[in-house]
Amino acid sequence: IQLWSTVDLPSTQTPLYMLVLYALIFFCGWGLSRGANLQKYFFKKDPTKTYLGIVPETITDGNRTLLVNGFWGLSRHINYLGEILMATGIILCVGHPTMLWPWLYPLYYVVLLFPRQIDDDKRCAAKYGALWQQYLTKVPYRIIPGIY
């Protein structure tokens, strides 16, 4: 897809500050995705251990425990936002912002992950019951903190 974006491009050079911005978008996405997945991994290994200096805050029903702070306190699927930002950062760096073809890559993640989040929430509601409802009040945003 990236090679298709180079066909018939104007020969303008992207300014350095824009390349830095594009790289920041990618690395913010990488930090969200990798950081959230690592926090979940370490929490499952030892629920009392801190991660990046953050003491885990949880809710429990006695049998099950859900993490409600750190990355997972920002939104219920913050790692999905990270994946979308990484794809966007890659396209901005290697594609041309005005070409359509490269944008299919981040659009693929949006089309894949937004419906998947709805399915994940349904599965979690069935699995955790009342605990999930309590979790929804603690972490109201689905993917994008403060927006959705």
What are these regions (language model features)?
Residues 1-148:
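Hydrophobic transmembrane alpha-helices
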